[in-house]
């Protein structure tokens, strides 16, 4: 029986990683398949998360799984700091994604 793969994407304050887990004969194995830098953009003194870069790196990690021939049946993304991004009707970001603590006041 072929192993079944599950992809976890962990995005931290300074880097992100794609971890592929599989179950084979009752044994779990994990491997890091992709890693990328993460950081903030300074926009006129405002610290912003580079959401476009994060999204591009998530896609690159998924491509790496395909290159390895290890296609996950499910995927989960874990981040810290930004709890939400507002989207319009076309699923595009509305405004910037600020990397500051006062954004909790917008809810």
Where are these regions (language model features)?
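Conserved small/polar residues in nucleotide/adenosyl-binding loops
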Residues: 103-107
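Acidic, proline/serine/threonine- and glycine-rich low-complexity intrinsically disordered segments
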Residues: 99-101
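N-terminal glycine/serine-rich phosphate-binding loop of ATP-dependent small-molecule kinases
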Residues: 1-96
